[in-house]
Amino acid sequence: MAIGNVSVVLVHGAWADGSSWSKVIERLEGQGIRAVAAPLPLTSLQDDVAALNRTLERIDGPVVLAGHAYAGAVIGSAHAENIKALVYVTALAPDEGETVGEVFYRAEPHPQAPRLAPDQHGLIWLPDEAFPAAFAQHAASQELAVLRAVQRPIAVACIGEPVGRPLWKDVPSWFLLAEDDRMIVPATQRYMAERMKATIKPHAVDHTPSVTAPTVVADIIRDAIRSVSYN
């Protein structure tokens, strides 16, 4: 199987949209790798998995799935037969019966992590000041302005629904461990990555490396593609 025959599906997390992957897409496409960003409604975990499955239905051939943050739970809940590997970009990986909230809050939060609470509509928004403080502290001011402008809230239902048997038990996985992450502390990332038996790639990046360190992200995705292409 040639590298160019593998498609990459990129899945955004909370407070973001598909544009957060734009720099990664540029790097993958520049290497002849087709990449598609899957849009999520962020209304419930079930809704998000259904949306991802609709994107996967449109793709022929083998797929490497990459998810950022909350989207780790989404890619782990997909079960399309053409998924050959998973890439967790400082992402949450609940095990069977666990919720996103349980793994997110399993450790003491970083001192600069924002306090999160739903509004009257059951939606959780990221405060503006949290973008430079914790979400993407390595980003340039122009990048932060865009991240704030396009943020999409996540519904409480997304983080309270237990997951089924995760796909990472059945296909190989890679984990970008963000050592400077202030949203999902590194200890929590390592706990999840080790129990997944993932190939762990630690880097001194923040919570949103798709924006602030896209080459690092693209290189790890390419490693996953190469592994499934030659095995």
Which residues are covered by each model-predicted region?
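Short beta-strand/loop motif that positions the catalytic acidic residue
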Residues: 175-177
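Flexible "cap/lid" loop of the alpha/beta hydrolase fold
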Residues: 82-128, 155-162, 192
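Gly/Ala-rich beta-loop-alpha elbow adjacent to hydrolase catalytic centers
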Residues: 66-75
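Short, proline-enriched alpha-helix->beta-strand connector loops that line the catalytic pocket
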Residues: 6, 168-173, 196-198
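Active-site nucleophile elbow and catalytic-triad environment of alpha/beta-hydrolase enzymes
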Residues: 146-167
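Glycine-rich phosphate-binding loop signature in dinucleotide/nucleotide-binding domains
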Residues: 3, 58-61, 169, 224-230
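Conserved loop-alpha-helix segment in the C-terminal half of the alpha/beta-hydrolase fold
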Residues: 179-204, 208-211, 216, 223-224
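Active-site catalytic motif of lipid deacylating hydrolases and related acyltransferases
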Residues: 4-61
